[in-house]
Amino acid sequence: MSHQRGGDSEGPQTSLERMNRFQAPEAGRIIAELGLPQGSRGLDVGCGVGLYALWLAEAVGSAGRVVGIEPETERVEAARALVGGQLASGRLEFRQGDGTNIPLPDRSVDWLWCGDVLHHIVETQLALREFRRVVRPGGQIIIKESQVLSALFLPGHPELERRIQLAEIRRTLDEGGGRSFQERRQTTLASLRAVGLTDVAVRNYLLQRRAPLGAADHDYIQNTVFTRNWGARLRELLTPADWDARSALCEPDSPKNILRSPDYFCLYPITVFHCGSTAAAR
């Protein structure tokens, strides 16, 4: 398998849906600023539960078409179940497919979206060349990566949060084929340039949430960030003192859980790498 999302003890569909719903308020703006043509054909590589594929399909209108691909059958079925019936037949389709071996003909789509997936693909340049193969000359390739810059989830505890983030980077070294996910995210621009994609606009978006948190925001921060990402998988990489401090702030039943604070806020960055032309030689 060419790409996997590691560490999903709660199940990948649940984790991905939580992240997408957390990002939903800003997703419309991010997609609108891409300027995708009405009636265009697009591909979502690593579509997850299909929410971004749905939003992209809505953006290109009733004459447009979006295909979402995932390497595992269960994820394709999950996307179909969650959003597959929300648009008229033919506008949104989900297929099994891999980012390094896309089941589409050459130059068959107007644009390609890859959201929070490229850093999971060990064969990065192979995937990017495959992206170029399926996008028509003059089309668009869009890579979205969350947390190229580190997020802030523990305001007032900067040193502890940095150590937790460092532990998470170390944990993803094996999952990332010897390079951490953070390193892969931060070298996205270099990877694009290495395959001849030099016409790249980079946009950064800063998501801000503050107390009282909405249900989707609380669900993502508590269950995906604190419990899944910063949970048992990091325990051996933190000192006992740091683990205890993390537990006091992050465990849902802790009276000191930071999400209980009326002053709580978080900052969460998203970076979009927008390649406006794919006409250069392969």
For the regions a protein language model found, what residue spans apply to each?
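A short acidic, Gly/Pro-enriched loop at the edge of an enzyme's catalytic core
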Residues: 100-111
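A short SAM/SAH-binding and catalytic strip from SAM-dependent methyltransferases
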Residues: 110-123
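Conserved catalytic/acceptor-binding region of the Class I
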Residues: 142-215
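C-terminal helical/coil "lid" or tail adjacent to the Rossmann-like core of SAM-dependent
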Residues: 2-12, 201-264
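Class I SAM-dependent methyltransferase SAM/SAH-binding core
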Residues: 43, 49-101
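Core SAM-dependent methyltransferase catalytic element
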Residues: 195-198, 268-282
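A short glycine-rich, Lys/Arg-flanked "PGG" loop and its adjoining helix->strand segment in the class I
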Residues: 125-140
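Conserved alpha-helix/loop element of class I SAM-dependent methyltransferases that forms part
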Residues: 21-38, 55
